[in-house]
Amino acid sequence: MFELPKLDYSNSALSPIMSEQTLDLHHGKHHQTYITNLNNFIKGSDYEKLSLEDIIKKSSNEKKAGIFNNASQHWNHNLFWKCMKPNGGGNVPTKLENKIKEDFGGFEKFREEFINAGVTQFGSGWCWLSLKEDKLVVTKSPNAENPIIHNMKPILGCDVWEHSYYLDYRNKRPAYLENFFDKLINWEYVDSLL
């Protein structure tokens, strides 16, 4: 059965970019609910023996919305928490920086594209930096959808569901995304996934 991962930082460590109250609710309540629901859905089924990624792929193909949504949200959040750190942002490791320049034509162009993907995601969803074959691509996805089901490898994800930012930013999703990008991203972790 799946369990809520322990964060690599305290619930107050990302403040004021992401408040302790937001992190308490987002990690301790929302993420925990996805895990509880997933465990209830798969208990006693063939899914119980599968890895999280295999559950996502199989349930997506079999149109098992309850299983897929909760499994995918669990995976998405696991990546999201790892992609942040206190005093994040800043310098990007050379390997990742060179790959970004190669695939996007420059870091600022990538930043703009990533933030724009999150801003323009209608309703709830995610924006992603993923490897598609050997190329980095920015995508967005609705609700719980994950690039894994499109044969991509996500290496950076930002949650743009309202529960991620509404307590701190109200309806200012662009400000949330800019702060996430400039002040929270753990570039060393993202680089390690290349």
Model-predicted segments: where are they?
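Feature for soluble, non-membrane regions of globular proteins
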Residues: 1-194
